[in-house]
Design a protein with these regions (language model features):
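Double-stranded RNA-binding/processing signature
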Residues: 1-174
């Protein structure tokens, strides 16, 4: 298939093959549309102009933020069928807040991918934004159902101890 050929080319012959190898290890698959992921890790301070438009990760970050919020809300809704709106909102807020996403991004190795794609110093506060942009890229390439599975299996279950967060949230409930 064409998608299979693109994946093969990206993995072995692309000028970004080092980036593609690290990205593939993180994602668990080789992306066919590598340019989406290159853009996801391109910070605005290191943007380039293509056809009169600056290329950086902010638009993908916007999209990924919305998708991440939606999927986390659905996940919590299903996982805690007796949780009221306040509890579910607090839990979602704890998961998608900048500090949490920055920490997840660091644990995932997003800083390594950003270092490859940027010539500027990478700060920890950029990692959560890049994680959201990554979610946006995964969504554009693979659709909602795949992205939901990716977020639940590769982010929520792998990098968050939601049970500890639940205990903490319960202790602070009125």
């Amino acid at each position: 298939t064409v998608k299979g050929l693109l994946k093969f080319f990206n993995r072995y012959f692309s000028k970004d093959k080092h980036f593609c190898g690290k990205l593939s290890s993180m994602l668990g698959y080789t992306p066919a549309h590598l340019e989406l992921y290159v853009q996801a890790f391109k910070h605005k301070s290191n943007s380039v102009e293509v056809n009169g438009h600056r290329q950086h990760n902010e638009r993908l970050e916007f999209l990924g933020d919305a998708i991440l919020n939606s999927i986390v809300a659905e996940y919590l809704y299903k996982k805690y069928p007796n949780g009221d709106e306040g509890f579910l909102t607090k839990m979602r807020s704890k998961i998608v807040k900048r500090k949490t996403l920055d920490a997840i991004g660091a644990r995932m190795g997003i800083d390594d991918l950003m270092t490859i794609m940027n010539k500027t110093q990478i700060s920890r506060s950029m990692l959560g934004n890049a994680l959201e942009a990554l979610v946006g890229a995964v969504y554009l390439e693979n659709g909602y159902a795949f992205t939901r599975k990716f977020i639940v299996l590769e982010i929520l279950r792998k990098y968050l101890d939601i049970h500890d967060d639940i205990e903490l949230a319960i202790k602070h409930m009125p």
